[in-house]
Amino acid sequence: MSALNVGRICIKTFGREKEAKCIVVDIIDKSFVLVTGPKELTGVKRRRANVKHLEATDDAINIKRGASDEDIIGALKKIGKLDEMRVKVKNKA
């Protein structure tokens, strides 16, 4: 759980948004976090996600807890990861 902090870029591993990248916006409790794509960027809507269904990456952006989608897009532009977020990750197996 400690790897999933606000601003961490993750990959969804289950559900209809499987293999899409998302960003942790808020920590709800020990089992759930609030994530967003943003939707217009990766297709991931702002929603609650189980931490067991996320794979944390080494990348993170500097955002405040509960940041808006516009703030997140701005932070991604600043570090040059905007285009990288659009690409889905293929399963390694």
PLM-predicted stretches and their roles:
Residues M1-V6, T13, I23-A93:
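Ferredoxin-like alpha/beta domains used as RNA- or RNAP-binding modules
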Residues G15-K18:
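Short, charged beta-turn/beta-strand-edge "cap" motif at the junction between a beta-strand
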